[in-house]
Regions:
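A short beta-strand-turn-helix
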Residues: 58-76
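Structural microenvironment flanking redox-active thiols in thiol-disulfide oxidoreductases
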Residues: 87-154
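Thiol/disulfide oxidoreductase modules built on the thioredoxin-like
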Residues: 73, 155-158, 164-202
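Bacterial N-terminal signal peptides
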Residues: 31-43
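Bacterial N-terminal signal peptides that target proteins for export
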Residues: 16-34
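A short, polar/charged loop-to-alpha-helix boundary motif
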Residues: 201-214
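Sec/Tat signal peptide C-region and signal peptidase I cleavage site
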Residues: 43-49
Length: 214
């Protein structure tokens, strides 16, 4: 209704003797239509409120092996949020972790695989089985780094992967349910957020933050 009024007022400007009144009416009509146009794109816009660096967060997750992990349990946490299609990015982050973090109980990497769809119960089982197989493959790759550094530890026990079907994990990062964003965050032992990126950080960037956290 307000749109029709503005439109009618705008057309009637030619019959208004005061140029200032006509200008105001046109400006209000333009503002209204611009607002309506922007509103159409808001659902697809980047609406999440990112976590604040320097703030403390106690975020809790359960990985695919049933391990309960937290960002404030006394370990430095490198957390990666990734969509299933971007798992190579998660691998790239892992490959850039400094060697002194490998097998070190003071450090931990958690990967959250976020699914935007709603798979069926059977679909979840298949996805979980596939994810476990890929995690085991990644463990073999990581084991080669352990062996090269003479770290006598099973690399598989140091891989923590959370399969987020319902958005309960990603929502703790203020991530919208249908978002497929990629994020990397580093938390100190007490859960203080030290750094965050929306792309794969360089090895130098990771090393700098992880060194400061120690």
């Amino acid at each position: 209704m307000e749109t029709l009024i503005y439109a009618g007022q705008a057309r009637g400007c030619q019959r208004i003797t005061s140029p200032s009144i006509c200008s105001v009416v046109k400006r209000r009509a333009l503002q209204f239509f611009l607002f309506a146009e922007i509103a159409l794109f808001l659902p697809a816009a980047h609406l999440r409120a990112e976590l604040s660096s320097g703030a403390t967060y106690s975020l809790s997750f359960v990985d695919m092996d049933g391990n309960k992990v937290s960002t404030a349990d006394g370990r430095v946490t490198l957390l990666v949020l990734v969509a299933a299609a971007d798992r190579e990015k998660a691998r790239a982050v892992g490959d850039r972790v400094p060697d002194y973090c490998l097998g070190n109980p003071d450090y931990r990497m958690i990967t959250i695989i976020h699914f935007t769809g709603k798979p069926t119960a059977i679909g979840r089982k298949l996805i979980t089985a596939l994810a476990k197989r890929r995690v085991n493959e990644e463990a073999k790759r990581l084991q080669t780094r352990y062996d090269a550094k003479k770290i006598t530890r099973d690399a598989r026990t140091d891989i923590f992967t959370v399969i987020d079907f319902d958005g309960s994990a990603s929502s703790q990062l203020n991530e919208p349910a249908q978002s497929a964003s990629f994020r990397v965050l580093v938390f100190a032992r007490d859960g203080k957020l030290l750094a965050q990126w929306n792309d794969v950080p360089s090895a130098e960037q990771l090393a700098e933050v992880l060194t400061q956290s120690h």
